[in-house]
């Protein structure tokens, strides 16, 4: 049976991968390069500085409540700057957004995985047309300093460069200082720089968002730093343009925004609304940056809304280089007045229209387009650009239907084979108990609203099971304690989409209170050691509590040398060593459970550590065997996943815990730590099931996850043209694939080892 089971498992893994490849096809980006056409206008800009600030939400630049006085003075009190709220299409992570900002294309959702993997070969787009390539083809020199993702995308494009690591999110100071320190060379006082294009990518804003959220006072300090940098660049170029009689452009933009927690990757208005500003030190524009009056649907979209990819044809036309072949952007209307006569401005818009038209009709000639629009004015061409762009964006998604259908057949067969294989595992009563959850899992995946608010369904299921215990006088006290715990667990973190911005227990009682954080941290850290007492376990618990509270301690005692020079990475490695030594010295069931529980606590946010105290009370009051116990432990794993603040959106993935104990980026180490931190709650319940239930629990989880994944794939196939396919169904598919593969493997491994220990 074991060999048959693992055969089915690997067949399901194959089916899952096949479906993902069909649903998230890695786009075969155009390898052709654009050439100048008869509409190409002369250049009106001689050099450009492209300043990318990671996670720069539109309101960070345009709202008076944020600290960018110099930039705002250019936008609101001068004629030298224009600003836009740029729509960054999902997925809102760095690599796909950089592809969009350089090629004008709309990247696929699979780029999320490449963004995390940082594969050099998988990431490079040098074979694809972009404004970076076009500048190189015109023998323009480009210098780059900042996020090394650019170096992976364009390995040989820059004459001078220095990269910084983007994934080490715990640093938000040095990572930006390492960019600015190149200014003495890039912006010399002699005004004799050697570049035609300078690209700078700052990461500090993004890292502060991940660590502390957009409401942190650190954000305004960082924004002022960015504003000072923009001021320095602007004044340098102003002086340079005056001396050399040239014209320069500064592009200040974000690759994406961030939500109210500080994360990104999803499709909320905060994540998809990025800043885009064009600053002209020696040119003036008549455009007035008027705030949008009705911002009810998007409070972050302060100025005129445009597609983020619109910056690509704008840069190309201003610099007099061909627009990338696969571009789907349209030139920003206000800049066309830089061509002083209307005829040339019209030619610039026609050049963009011709490039977009070739995507739809490759056989189109310039003469045909010229004839079609010979009597049209500039506004007519702009309208045609808008309509054509809308059509091309709508057609940008492609699927491999054959792969998807074959994969669904394989996954369906795996589900049926699993039911046949374990048909003797359950009696009629047990099948009846699990049936509602099978039906529930099927219903959830066919509704975008249910997927977004799935946590509500699992909370309801947990409460219902606890209420059942109130019917029996013997379990009435246990049921009451469970309901008490669940009432707090449900309100600990607001998650999902609809009510995620509402205040929760963390916001109101834990985050503002040093006392509450300290009490909950210390109590939670010592709970595993109390369950499995030994001197080394208590020492590990003490070290974990000290490590978690160190940021609080350092605020008050930072003047002490031992605090100021505290090495977090080395200290975490000491904790890891203690956990390993403790288990090897006494390899028992309780000891392994204790060490893994402590490891999970180490990778949990300080504000969430108190949840494990509630889990502990809930678990101790559960029945130790029987159908109800099996169902309750299955539901508890789901509840724990959501109660820690997770959801079916990639935006809730907390990268900050994935670097615990690391001093550099390593994909395997980060992957393991990230997986553990995301599924920490579910893993805790896996560890704390009664030993005699573990094998049965693994098989139950397998059947449930297999059926759920099969029907989710069917749902994604049916809903592939749904409005929320990328923002709702796609992240859910990635999560479910992780549940059915990585989490199941971890659960299987833990159960196999623990069952064999005494």
Curated annotation (Swiss-Prot):
Keywords linked to the UniProt accession: Endoplasmic reticulum, Glycoprotein, GPI-anchor biosynthesis, Membrane, Transferase, Transmembrane, Transmembrane helix
Organism from which the protein derives: Schizosaccharomyces pombe (strain 972 / ATCC 24843)
GO function term, MF aspect, one: CP2 mannose-ethanolamine phosphotransferase activity
Keyword Transmembrane listed: yes
Name listed for the protein in its UniProt record: GPI ethanolamine phosphate transferase 2
Gene encoding the protein: las21
Protein family: Belongs to the PIGG/PIGN/PIGO family. PIGG subfamily.
SUPFAM superfamilies documented for this protein: Alkaline phosphatase-like (SSF53649)
EC top class named in words: transferase
Pathway: Glycolipid biosynthesis; glycosylphosphatidylinositol-anchor biosynthesis
